[in-house]
Amino acid sequence: MATILTLAGDGIGPEIMTQAIDVLNAVNNKFALGLTLESGLIGGVAVDATGEPLPEETLQRARAADAVLLGAVGGPKWDGIERSKRPERGLLKIRSELGLFANLRVAKLYPQLVNASSIKPEIISGLDLLIVRELTGGIYFGEPRGIRTLENGEQQGYNTMVYSTSEINRIGKVAFELAQTRAQAAGTPAKVCSIDKANVLEVTELWKQTMIELQQAEYSDVALSHMYADNACMQLIKDPKQFDVMVTGNLFGDILSDEAAMLTGSIGMLPSASLDEAGKGMYEPCHGSAPDIAGQDIANPLATILSVAMMLRYTFKQEVAAQAIEQAVSDVLDDGLRTVDILDRNEAGLIQVGCQQMGQAVLAKLL
C-alpha cells in the first residue's frame, strides 16, 4: 500500500488541499489504487507550531512517503522573521532533501478558457507545452551567498550561480525522454528547446555545450534548439506553440513557468511535479499562498486537483485515473463553472463559483 503525505501549508493552501483530497479519495476508491493519506506541517503554520518551516517529523514522513502533495507556503505574517526560518525555506529544503531535481510544469490551454487569456485566441488555441526546470541547483542554492558590509560601510548582496555537467546531464535526460514520450503520443517529431544566457554567463555556456553533447550522444532522434532567456520570454508571448518541451535552470525556469501560466488564463490552472531520479515526487500548484484571498472561498482549486492527476501519472503510473481527473476538470469547464480568476464576464452562460463549489463539481463528475 502506497502512502501520500499531504502538506496544506499556508494561505489558501488548506482550502485547495481539501478539494484535492476529496478528488484523490474518490479516484482511490473508484480505481482501487490502495493509497493511504497522511498529513503534516510545512511553512508558516509549521513555524508557528514548532519554530521551524520544515519540522524534522515532516521531513522524515516525506522521505517515507511515496509522494507528497503540497498546497502553498508563505505570507506577510512571517516576512519579518529570521531568513532561515521563513516559510519558503521549508519548501526549498524539502525539495533539496528529497532530491527533487526535476520540476515539470505543463502549460495547457483548455479550449473552454481561450477567452480567459490576455493573448489572442489564434495565438494560443491548442497550446500544450512542458517546461522542465532544474530545481535543486543554480543560483537559489549556490554558495557563497549572503549580505555583507564592505570596508566603506556599504552593504552588498551576493549569490552564486553554479551548475556541474552531471546536474545538466541529469535534467537534460528528463527533458529529452519526456519529449520522446510526448511526440509518440501526439504523432509529431520530438523537440526540445534549451534556454540559457550563454552569451553572458559562463555557467550557461557550459549548460548549452553539455546539452549539445548529450543530444548528440544519446538523443539524436530529438531535435535540439537553443534560445536566450530574454528572447524566450518574448517568444512565449509572440508564438508559444513553437515550443513543445523547454528545459532550463532554476532561475530562468522559475520566471518562464510563471509567464507560461498566464497563457492559460490563470496560474490557478497550472499543476506541477517535482521528481527525484526514481520518479518519486512532490506535487503542487504553481501558484503561491495568496494570503490576500485566503479564507474567502474564491481560490481556484483546479491546479491542485490537476497536480493529483500528475501524481497518479508520474509516480504511481495510473494513467487511466489521471485522465479521469483531467476529463472531470474539462467537463466542469464545459458546464460553464468558473472561479473568479478564469471568469470572462463578457462570455454568456458562465457561472461564477467558489473554491468549494468548483472542487465538489469535479468530484461529482468522478462519482
Swiss-Prot record:
Primary localization class, coarse: cytoplasm
PROSITE patterns documented for this protein: IDH_IMDH (PS00470)
Cellular location(s): Cytoplasm
Protein name: 3-isopropylmalate dehydrogenase
Cofactor note: Binds 1 Mg(2+) or Mn(2+) ion per subunit.
Cofactor(s) it depends on: Mg(2+); Mn(2+)
Reaction(s) this enzyme catalyzes, per UniProt: (2R,3S)-3-isopropylmalate + NAD(+) = 4-methyl-2-oxopentanoate + CO2 + NADH
Functional pathway: Amino-acid biosynthesis; L-leucine biosynthesis; L-leucine from 3-methyl-2-oxobutanoate: step 3/4
Subunit structure: Homodimer.
Protein purpose: Catalyzes the oxidation of 3-carboxy-2-hydroxy-4-methylpentanoate (3-isopropylmalate) to 3-carboxy-4-methyl-2-oxopentanoate. The product decarboxylates to 4-methyl-2 oxopentanoate.
Family (UniProt): Belongs to the isocitrate and isopropylmalate dehydrogenases family. LeuB type 1 subfamily.
One GO cellular component term: cytosol
Keyword Transmembrane helix set for record: no
GO molecular function, one term: NAD binding
UniProt EC number: 1.1.1.85
InterPro entries: IsoCit/isopropylmalate_DH_CS (IPR019818), IsoPropMal-DH-like_dom (IPR024084), Isopropylmalate_DH (IPR004429)
One BP annotation, GO: L-leucine biosynthetic process
Keyword NAD: yes
Site keyed Important for catalysis: positions: 140, 197
Binding residues for substrate: 95, 105, 133, 230
Keywords of this entry: Amino-acid biosynthesis, Branched-chain amino acid biosynthesis, Cytoplasm, Leucine biosynthesis, Magnesium, Manganese, Metal-binding, NAD, Oxidoreductase
Positions with a binding annotation for Mg(2+): 230, 254, 258
Annotated NAD(+) binding sites: 75-88, 288-300
